[in-house]
Design a protein with these regions (language model features):
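Transmembrane helix interruption/hinge and helix-loop junction motifs
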Residues: 23-30
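Alpha-helical transmembrane segments of multi-pass membrane proteins
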Residues: 34-44, 70-78, 105-116
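Juxtamembrane helix-capping/reentrant segments at transmembrane boundaries
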Residues: 52-74
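Mid-chain, well-packed structural core segment of small domains
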Residues: 66-106
Length: 158
């Protein structure tokens, strides 16, 4: 079958999204939100830099490297959840685990990106409701507390 490049790209994206949804379930939606947040942060940062005549290819490149590092951290979080699940299931340790590290990490990064987007919007001259930034900070603290709580429980059990 000879598909044109646009159809081939659509088919590949559809297959990728279907595979992720099949593999990750509801976490695929969270992953998609994170990817969108990263893109919006990069775009809003670019717009803010251009508006303020401060755009620099080196800074843009550093931003992309930062995003690449975030992707690696999220992959480590997903692998961590996978290993904990497999060990609990396969070694008969009686651990019932559906994953905590991956969604918490994604949520933390989504809120961090949202905060960065708001900072970029301020640089664009947009007024931000103070309660919105407060909600983001409170939510980040809650995610940190949940992550720390889970880590503390693991340390205590050893």
């Amino acid at each position: 079958m000879n598909m044109n490049p646009i159809l081939r790209t659509k088919a590949a994206l559809t297959a990728l999204i279907w595979s992720l949804t099949s593999l990750l379930g509801w976490k695929a939606s969270l992953t998609l939100v994170w990817v969108i947040a990263m893109a919006l942060d990069y775009l809003s940062g670019t717009f803010a830099a251009m508006k303020n005549r401060a755009w620099c290819s080196e800074t843009a490149r550093q931003g992309l490297w930062h995003k690449a590092g975030m992707i690696l951290v999220v992959l480590v979080a997903a692998l961590t959840d996978g290993v904990i699940y497999l060990v609990g299931q396969r070694l008969g340790m009686g651990i019932s685990y559906s994953g905590l590290v991956f969604p918490l990490t994604l949520s933390w990064y989504i809120l961090t990106e949202a905060g960065s987007i708001l900072e970029n919007c301020v640089k664009l001259g947009v007024k931000i409701p103070s309660w919105l930034t407060k909600i983001l900070k409170i939510s980040l603290k809650s995610i940190d507390a949940a992550g720390e709580s889970g880590a503390d429980e693991q340390e205590e059990s050893h």
